[in-house]
Amino acid sequence: MSRLDKSKVINSALELLNEVGIEGLTTRKLAQKLGVEQPTLYWHVKNKRALLDALAIEMLDRHHTHFCPLEGESWQDFLRNNAKSFRCALLSHRDGAKVHLGTRPTEKQYETLENQLAFLCQQGFSLENALYALSAVGHFTLGCVLEDQEHQVAKEERETPTTDSMPPLLRQAIELFDHQGAEPAFLFGLELIICGLEKQLKCESGS
């Protein structure tokens, strides 16, 4: 049996997450999957919260590819691309949004967040509004993915409701959403946030 290290623990935990979801993910089940005694895991993850924090970081490291603005990128495009990349990372694993809930920046992420704030401040945002802009986009993205992933679970567990008895506009709206999926609604909301931030920035600058 190969030596157990944190990388192997995290990889196995992500596999288990996809199999059983966040509610079924326990250190006991993870230990069984790894073929070790549960106390052995405590050398690598102290408890489930520590495990979830580690999984959240791993998802971002693997799938979030647009942390910082590219050279010449506008702040609007940066926020768009950052949000899309964050969404992809959350969708990369079952219950990805739930895993990310309640996490806090790690020391490894400090420089990235500092660069994001500095970039927005250079574009004319106050520090306060730069913080709120990043928070608004991040929380919106997280909420959209959380709803999307929960909707998929609920859809599998309940009978598909008939739309025959619904009023016509509601029926068309539901059929449209079911056909298009969640991404168009996410992109629409993201653009509304960015438009609002543009207006706020103009008010701040007096233009």
UniProtKB/Swiss-Prot annotation:
Q: Where does tetracycline bind?
A: H64, N82
Biological process terms in GO annotation: negative regulation of DNA-templated transcription; response to antibiotic
Binding-site positions, Mg(2+): H100
Keywords noted in UniProt: Antibiotic resistance, DNA-binding, Magnesium, Metal-binding, Repressor, Transcription, Transcription regulation, Transposable element
Enumerate the Pfam families for this protein. Answer: TetR_C_1, TetR_N
Answer yes or no on keyword Transcription: yes
- Recorded superkingdom: Bacteria
**Gene Ontology MF terms:** DNA-binding transcription factor activity; metal ion binding; transcription cis-regulatory region binding
Domain HTH tetR-type, first and last residues per copy: 3-63
The cross-references to SUPFAM superfamilies, in alphabetical order and at most eight, read:
Homeodomain-like, Tetracyclin repressor-like, C-terminal domain
Whereabouts does the entry annotate DNA binding, in residue ranges? Answer: 26-45
Tell me which InterPro entries the record gives.
DNA-bd_HTH_TetR-type_CS, Homeodomain-like_sf, HTH-type_TetR-like_transc_reg, HTH_TetR, Repressor_TetR_C, Tet_transcr_reg_TetR, Tet_transcr_reg_TetR-rel_C_sf
Asked if the Swiss-Prot or TrEMBL record annotates the protein with the keyword Ion transport, the reply is no
Task: Report the NCBIfam families cross-referenced here.
Answer: PRK13756.1
Biological role: TetR is the repressor of the tetracycline resistance element; its N-terminal region forms a helix-turn-helix structure and binds DNA. Binding of tetracycline to TetR reduces the repressor affinity for the tetracycline resistance gene (tetA) promoter operator sites.
According to UniProt, the name of this protein is Tetracycline repressor protein class B from transposon Tn10
Gene name per UniProt: tetR
